[in-house]
């Protein structure tokens, strides 16, 4: 697929600390967070002017789904815009708590596990052609996705009966099968529920739910772009060595528990291979594929970072990517803190730091502290992120949705939208179906807008 549509969904962890007598349940905290949204959207499930969807998911987790993007830098900017929008709701909610005499602070974490062991996700979406063999795509992709954590995990201190352990991935402990149509009860690597949000005869949406939520822009870019490159290679029928894993679920945990990337996992054919070996093979195949087909500046940057991350893991010299890869940046931060204060990995203060890395409040979160000190690399500017809060991508269907919502709100018209429908509720027959996610211009939508 020459042009691909991408989307990213992040669920956020919510917690609240109280200094007074009055305590709120997570549900009540979520209601405070979404009060402003409900006041204008009449619902806690809304689409925004930038084409994105914002809603309260199961278990009081706010979720932000980016608009459709056909450019990965746009996608990184829109993912970060989601953080900024939620940070605004958080500041608003704290203000409202104070006005009501409740002494408390609300925290939003862009991570994947809470202290009670619950997991919430980061879901990646890649549009693929319907005519390909989805089973074959999944077969080649799963070994890549299981081992990809060593280049784009978010890192986590895992408390076990045998003591604390620093893991590469947050989600690895919570994945229970390879391919499935459920997303919550049995968390698979690839979700097969067939909801393309597009013309179902032409397209399918590959829904990857194994990944960690990333704070680092560069890690997010590497996660998405490496997967896109592997997909392109599969779509071009490039032959691959068979890395089918005997037990992907055991493998994903074993790899997460090994920062060296060297632990061997069993393959279905009886051989063994390490995460480093499997990733190197995918990288080499992608590199020679790109040498033949060409790539842009972003692609070159991603291939260089992918290569350097594998070198850092293999050599043990993690400083090579400490400014770019989440799990490494966090590990280095925790190690410095432990050395300074003489703490063990199982110390509650280390657990607190582990969590605070993911705090999206820019004056509190440790990731943002590192970024403000110039210790984390960027791929998009603050201006681009700010614009993405209100302006949809201009080259996809999201533009149509965003323009429609903006105009309907300005004209105070009652409307309903989802990923494919735009509807004015006060005119019985005024619904436009937008089945092509690549289409940013549509006369029918322009007419609908002009008629307001």
Swiss-Prot record:
Positions bound to Mg(2+): 9, 55, 63
GO biological process, any: modification-dependent protein catabolic process
Disulfide bridge positions per record: none
Pathway: Protein degradation; proteasomal Pup-dependent pathway; Protein modification; protein pupylation
Active site: 57 (proton acceptor)
Catalytic activity: ATP + [prokaryotic ubiquitin-like protein]-L-glutamate + [protein]-L-lysine = ADP + phosphate + N(6)-([prokaryotic ubiquitin-like protein]-gamma-L-glutamyl)-[protein]-L-lysine
Keyword Lipid biosynthesis: no
Binding site for ATP: 53, 66, 419
Keyword tRNA processing: no
Family: Belongs to the Pup ligase/Pup deamidase family. Pup-conjugating enzyme subfamily.
Protein function: Catalyzes the covalent attachment of the prokaryotic ubiquitin-like protein modifier Pup to the proteasomal substrate proteins, thereby targeting them for proteasomal degradation. This tagging system is termed pupylation. The ligation reaction involves the side-chain carboxylate of the C-terminal glutamate of Pup and the side-chain amino group of a substrate lysine.
Protein name: Pup--protein ligase
Species in which this protein is naturally found: Thermobifida fusca (strain YX)
Taxonomic placement: Bacteria, Bacillati, Actinomycetota, Actinomycetes, Streptosporangiales
């Amino acid at each position: 697929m020459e042009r691909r549509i991408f989307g990213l969904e992040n669920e956020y962890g919510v917690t609240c600390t109280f200094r007074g007598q009055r305590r709120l349940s997570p549900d009540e905290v979520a209601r405070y967070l979404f009060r402003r949204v409900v006041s204008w959207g009449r619902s806690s499930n809304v689409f925004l002017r930038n084409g994105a969807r914002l809603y309260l998911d199961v278990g009081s987790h706010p979720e932000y789904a980016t608009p459709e993007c056909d450019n990965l830098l746009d996608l990184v900017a829109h993912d970060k815009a989601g953080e900024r929008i939620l940070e605004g709701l958080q500041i608003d909610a704290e203000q409202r708590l104070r006005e009501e005499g409740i002494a408390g602070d609300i925290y939003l974490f862009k991570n994947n596990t809470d202290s009670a062991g619950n997991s919430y996700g980061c879901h990646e979406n890649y549009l693929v052609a319907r005519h390909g063999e989805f089973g074959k795509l999944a077969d080649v992709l799963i070994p890549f996705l299981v081992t990809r954590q060593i280049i784009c995990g978010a890192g986590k201190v895992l408390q076990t009966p045998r003591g604390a352990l620093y893991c590469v991935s947050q989600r690895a402990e919570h994945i229970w099968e390879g391919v499935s149509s459920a997303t919550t009860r049995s968390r698979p690597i690839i979700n097969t529920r067939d909801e393309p949000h597009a013309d179902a005869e032409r397209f399918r949406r590959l829904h990857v739910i194994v990944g960690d939520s990333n704070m680092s822009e560069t890690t997010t870019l590497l996660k998405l772009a490496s997967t896109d490159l592997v997909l392109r290679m599969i779509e071009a029928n490039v032959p691959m060595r068979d890395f089918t894993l005997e037990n992907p679920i055991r493998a994903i945990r074993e790899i997460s528990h090994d920062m060296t990337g060297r632990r061997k996992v069993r393959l279905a054919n009886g051989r063994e291979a390490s995460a480093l070996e499997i990733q190197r093979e995918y990288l080499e195949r992608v590199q020679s594929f790109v040498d033949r087909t060409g790539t842009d500046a972003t692609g070159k940057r991603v291939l260089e970072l992918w290569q350097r991350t594998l070198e850092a893991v293999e050599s043990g010299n993690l400083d090579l990517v400490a400014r770019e890869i989440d799990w490494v940046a966090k590990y280095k931060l925790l190690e410095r803190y432990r050395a300074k204060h003489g703490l063990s990995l199982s110390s509650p203060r280390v657990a607190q730091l582990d969590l605070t890395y993911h705090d999206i409040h820019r004056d509190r979160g440790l990731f943002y502290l590192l970024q403000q000190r110039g210790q984390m690399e960027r791929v998009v500017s603050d201006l681009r992120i700010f614009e993405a809060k209100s302006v949809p991508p201009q080259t996809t269907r999201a533009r149509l949705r965003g323009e429609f919502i903006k105009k309907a709100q300005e004209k105070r018209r009652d409307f309903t939208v989802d990923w494919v429908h735009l509807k004015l509720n006060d005119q019985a027959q005024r619904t436009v179906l937008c089945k092509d996610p690549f289409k940013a211009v549509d006369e029918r939508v322009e007419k609908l807008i002009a008629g307001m």
